[in-house]
Curated annotation (Swiss-Prot):
UniProt organism field: Arabidopsis thaliana
SUPFAM superfamilies, per the entry: Kelch motif
Superkingdom classification of source: Eukaryota
Kelch repeat ranges per the UniProt record: 120-165, 167-212
Protein name (database record): Putative F-box/kelch-repeat protein At2g29860
UniProt entry tagged with the keyword Repeat: yes
Annotated segments matching region Disordered: 1-20
Domain F-box intervals: 17-63
Keywords: Kelch repeat, Repeat
Length: 240
């Protein structure tokens, strides 16, 4: 709870008609920083000054410094071929739980590879009548997005993983040693291939169904078919 009291002798202390938009932004920031983010859309309607503070990067820095962190789940949901995948957010609000679509983010390609670093979500590749190499970065603070440099190869249902601050993307294309793995440097925002050997067990299209990152290793699971039977196998990349 935030308590406000009149400060006598101030420039507006004797003015009972002072509007919220006349409050200093530093004061507004101190007011809204401890308040849960679910109330920010309503608070942003109070005035232009409130809206400016709530959408500023400084408020995120202030909240982080004060230890106000709220767990938020982002869901990438779609039903191919009927609907293209969209981003949804599940968060606690003034009602217990609410799943809300993020209309500020564009449609995503089915089969895209997704990783998170800090407050940024990286969406790589997918399928748009054919595999694509598109890379999108989402800023979870403001739910804005922009394109990054494309991957060197188009990939669909690839296995991604973050190790030591670098993004590895594995498979998702016709298997060949030359470009089975590539890595993205988030500092220079550039891609390069990683010399490796394709697993003999992988399917020709190199599609993975799930993956995990554990102790410096990226493990991808793919399905294989043999005489009308489907079974699972896995392949791992160890990054030293």
């Amino acid at each position: 709870m935030v308590l406000l009291s009149e400060i006598p002798g101030g420039s507006n202390g004797d003015d009972p008609n002072m509007n919220p938009q006349e409050l200093p932004e530093e004061l507004i920031e101190s007011i809204v920083a401890p308040i849960p983010r679910c109330y920010y859309p309503s608070l942003s309607l109070l005035s232009r000054a409130f809206r400016h503070v709530i959408t500023s990067q400084q408020l995120f820095v202030t909240r982080s410094g004060l230890g106000f962190k709220e767990p938020v789940l982002y869901a990438f949901i779609g039903c191919t071929p009927y609907t293209t995948p969209r981003w949804f957010i599940l968060r606690r609000s003034n009602i217990p739980l609410q799943l809300r679509r993020l209309n500020s983010l564009p449609h995503m390609f089915p089969g895209a590879a997704v990783v998170t670093i800090g407050y940024k979500i990286y969406v790589m590749g997918g399928y748009n009548y054919q595999p694509v190499s598109t890379v999108i970065i989402i800023d979870c603070r403001f739910h804005t997005w922009h394109y990054l440099q494309d991957m060197q190869r188009a990939r669909y249902h690839a296995t991604p993983g973050v190790i030591d601050g670098r993004i590895y993307v594995i498979g998702g294309r016709k298997k060949q040693d030359a470009d089975w793995v590539e890595v993205f440097d988030v500092t220079t925002e550039s891609w390069e291939t990683v010399p490796t050997q394709c697993p003999n067990e992988a399917s020709e299209n190199g599609l993975f169904v799930t993956y995990a990152v554990m102790q410096g290793r990226i493990l991808g699971v793919f399905l294989l078919t043999n005489q009308d039977k489907v079974y699972g196998s896995h392949w791992e990349l160890y990054v030293s």
